[in-house]
């Protein structure tokens, strides 16, 4: 299985101090002292969303978030003579709705294009079409203000709406229903924001492959440098459990990304690269996403 602004800096120029208008009284010493000791402006708000790690902060009731994402990926097997390689380009759209305090729901639909070196003469090397659809819900069961910690659980089902493989084309889905869940955590420490995710998914129904299930472990660390800029790093681990003699597929990625929250819009751009793998077809993956809140 293939594990799938120009930023304008506003500068302030120095301008000469305008003289007081005739008859305007100077500021009193008390007012000057109060202005001098005004508290510093608050730190910028922290954004919990990350590139590849889920967060534990649900959408508020009655609010809606729409996200558009593009995620190309490349992979290759080890070896020189029998090396196999390929790439996938996926576009996804998701809608998340806040249902209740601490509860939201999401639906994700997508389209994918797959190109791979044929595994045998005459085998298909290309495929395109709808991707699988995901329906999920998230419940935050703990929220602390000091220290800032959110804990949540999510559960979801993946519907095999992807185009099935055929003798003349590659498939764009898993050809099986999948159910899964995750434990999510988000935490704040000053301007640092951290996230963690532990999840598992498994196919249900008649078996269509050797896949038993997929374990996911993600950890992320971001720094809110400015109100509109948060660089972040992640470690992403996936372990696909296989049946029979086929070995399990294990991959560890390192991710670098920029999270750019601007009012009701959040942009994410980043990439992840495999740093360790066993028995898996792996390669780099990128993401570019825009989320709009209403």
Annotate each language-model stretch with its function.
Residues 16-17:
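N-terminal signal peptide c-region/cleavage motif recognized by signal peptidases
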Residues 22-292:
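Transmembrane beta-barrel domains of Gram-negative outer membranes and organellar outer membranes
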Residues 2-10:
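Sec-dependent signal peptide recognition
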């Amino acid at each position: 299985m293939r594990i799938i602004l120009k930023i304008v800096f506003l500068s302030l120029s120095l301008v000469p101090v305008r003289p007081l208008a005739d008859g305007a009284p100077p500021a009193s010493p008390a007012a000057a002292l109060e202005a001098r000791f005004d508290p510093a402006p608050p730190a910028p708000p922290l954004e919990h969303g990350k590139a590849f790690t889920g967060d534990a902060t649900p959408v508020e009731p009655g609010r809606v978030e729409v996200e558009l994402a593009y995620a190309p990926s490349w992979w290759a097997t080890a070896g020189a003579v029998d090396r196999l390689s390929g790439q996938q380009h996926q576009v996804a759209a998701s809608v998340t709705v806040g249902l209740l305090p601490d509860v939201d729901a999401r639906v994700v639909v997508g389209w994918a294009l797959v190109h791979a070196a044929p595994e045998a003469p005459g085998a298909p090397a290309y495929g395109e079409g709808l991707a699988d659809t995901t329906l999920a819900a998230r419940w935050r069961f703990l929220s602390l203000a000091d220290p800032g910690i959110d804990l949540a659980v999510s559960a979801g089902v993946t519907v095999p709406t992807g185009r099935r493989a055929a003798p003349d084309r590659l498939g764009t889905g898993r050809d099986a229903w999948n159910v899964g869940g995750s434990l999510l955590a988000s935490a704040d420490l000053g301007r640092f924001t951290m996230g963690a995710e532990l999840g598992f998914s498994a196919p249900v129904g008649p078996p269509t492959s050797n896949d038993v299930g997929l374990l996911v472990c993600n950890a992320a660390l971001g720094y809110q440098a400015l109100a509109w800029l948060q660089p972040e790093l992640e470690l992403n681990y996936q372990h696909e459990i296989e049946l029979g003699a086929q070995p399990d597929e294990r991959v560890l990625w390192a991710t670098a990304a920029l999270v750019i929250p601007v009012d009701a819009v959040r942009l994410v751009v980043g990439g992840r690269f495999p740093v360790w793998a066993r028995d898996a077809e792996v390669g780099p993956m990128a993401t570019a996403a825009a989320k709009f809140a209403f």
